[in-house]
Regions:
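Surface-exposed loop/turn elements that mediate protein-protein interactions on large endomembrane-trafficking
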Residues: 93-111, 133-153, 174-190, 216-243
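Canonical WD40 repeat/beta-propeller blade segments in eukaryotic WD-repeat proteins
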Residues: 108-119, 151-162, 189-203, 208-209, ...
Length: 250
């Protein structure tokens, strides 16, 4: 309702009384605090973009009992690659074994001096990667002379790897896709429009999953024929939308 007495109205017009002008001349040049109100800034919070990951790998089980920590670097239809660490001595090893024991069963243990974070077993051998190093160990000749190691620059590290029949592929933090022969010769260096998320390989085919742009969550894929050096398929990866109710209850 209306006020009957103007004297009851609080003086909030932004001006200084006449008898205060001399002492408060600076206040006159400044509007009242309530003269302008900034609109709240609303920042839309979207989903976090998918980072790189290695297919068929696991993390160390935090509930591991005993002195040895184990994690699968790879578990596929061919076999498994397991990284182990003795918590007492700090000794690290990598073990590879076939599901079909007629192919050789368990391979000799690989001493891990660099801390391998990625691993995959292919038709010709085992590919391991850590920091700025990749290491390939073939099955046919499980000797030191048959293996090879490649050192990349310190600012480029492997993020996901794959093994085909006669090639190995390494995606790196510099957004490069490097393809090598099983003997260690580099065949291709490709660059994608967005970060590579994961790789998978079979026979001569290499599947690449990547983000459309660096800040985007949209995922795309390409399937490359490494032997013929052609792109066989390409498209978008369908993803379900986030469910806010499930997110709130999680």
């Amino acid at each position: 309702g209306e006020l009957d007495d103007d004297d009851d109205m609080e003086d909030d017009d932004g001006f200084v009384e006449e008898d205060e002008k001399e002492n408060c001349h600076r206040e006159l040049a400044r509007p009242a605090a309530t003269a302008y109100v900034s609109a709240p800034v609303v920042v839309a919070k979207g989903p976090k973009p998918q980072g790189p990951f290695q297919v068929n790998s696991t993390k160390v089980n935090p509930d591991t009992v005993g002195a040895q920590k184990r994690r699968f670097l790879c578990y596929n239809t061919l076999g498994s690659v397991v990284a182990t660490e003795d918590t007492n001595s700090g000794l690290k090893n990598v073990e590879m074994s076939f599901h079909d024991t007629s192919k050789g069963g368990r391979m000799p243990t690989i001493t891990d001096d660099v801390g391998y974070e990625l691993g995959v077993c292919g038709e010709k051998g085992v590919l391991l990667a850590a920091k700025s190093q990749i290491f390939f160990k073939p099955y046919e000749s499980w000797t030191k002379d048959s293996e090879w190691t490649l050192e990349m620059s310190e600012d480029e590290r492997p993020t996901t790897i794959a093994c085909g029949d006669d090639f190995v592929a390494v995606a790196t933090s510099q957004n490069f896709l490097r393809v090598f022969t099983s003997y260690g010769a580099q065949k291709e260096v490709l660059n994608f429009e967005g970060p590579i998320v994961s790789l998978a390989a079979s026979n001569d085919a290499l599947a690449v999953c990547y983000r459309e742009h660096f800040s985007e969550c949209k995922l795309k894929f390409k399937v490359l024929d490494v032997e013929k050096r052609v792109e066989k398929y390409a498209g978008n990866i369908p993803l379900s939308s986030l469910n806010s109710d499930e997110d709130d209850n999680s």
